[in-house]
Structures are given as structure tokens and as C-alpha cells.
Amino acid sequence: MKYRMNIAGLDRDLPLCKVSDDLYIGAFVMFGDAEITVACARELLARAPKDYDYLLTAEAKSIPLIHEMARQSGAREYFVARKGLKVYMPHPLHVTVRSITTQHDQDLYLSGEEADKIRGKRVLIVDDVISTGESLRAMEELVEKAGGTVAGRMAVLAEGDAQARKDIVYLNKLPVFNADGTVKE
């Protein structure tokens, strides 16, 4: 089963993936789709606040998006909250998150060097899909721990209850689905 939708002026068929017996989600994956990545970056930047210093996302599906947003905006640097601690990340900051797509606790890390750069700066948080808001909350916590300020929150798609949030900017709504592929009411 697939769900067809228009995203940043482009039609895409999202496969429906089982989360539980009565909940399916549309899988939006930008990996390998340069056309959608470029279009989404352009549309998000057109709606982005102008007063941010850095972009931040969580590993991994939003990395192509944030890279393209940095490229289009002329930003020389952006940050990716990593899902695992790496040896090249001394003095890291870390938070724990539970995401709908991973279905288990997951840690996110910023290196001490990245945290130092964020201190006193305004950070625009970017994600591919905001659903439960847990990944977003974890990135907000990392920014705050680093001494930065959240300048805004953006996503390509808002899924389920996230569509009602007033504190995020997104390009389109992504419904959640029943097992038969119909949209959940």
C-alpha cells in the first residue's frame, strides 16, 4: 500500500509501514531523491526565520536535507546530533529520546566542540518528519544544554498530532493510517 502526496510541488508515493496492528505510517525517505531534497530545502528556507546562526538535525534521514539547506543558504557549517558516541567527539553532550520510528530509547550526542560553537547562538532545528515530537524535544534539549537558543523548528512533514502544533513550520501534513490503508480519523 502507498499514499500519494504532493511535497514541495512534487508528487511522491509513500509506502505505508506497520507501527502496530492498528497504526501504519507513510514512510518519507529523502535518501537518494535529490529532486525532493533540493525542493524541500528551498521551500523550508523560504519559510525559515532569518535570525538563526546554525542549523541542527538528528542523524540520519534529515542529513541530506540540512546539507542542502546549508548549501542553498550559504551556511558554512551545520550540526548533526549523532545517534552514537564517536571517538572523535570529546566532552559530548547527550540526551535520550524515544522515537516512533525506532520504537526504543535512543541517545543523541553533540561533541563538546559543537556545543561550544552553539553557546550563545540561535539554532534552527530541522527534521524530515515531526510526529510525536520526541526527536524535536531531544534536539531542543541539546541546544539548551549547549547554552544556545532555539530560533525555530521546521520539518518537511507534520504527522498525526504534530499537525496541531503552533511552534513548528512544515510544508505538508502527513496523516497516519489504519491497517487497511485508510486515513485514521
What name fits each language-model region?
Residues 52-59:
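Short glycine-rich phosphate-binding loop at a beta-alpha junction
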Residues 77-123:
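Short, glycine/charge-rich flexible loops or terminal/linker lids adjacent to PRPP-binding catalytic cores
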Residues 128, 133:
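Conserved G/P- and acidic residue-centered "switch" motifs that form tight phosphate/ATP-binding loops
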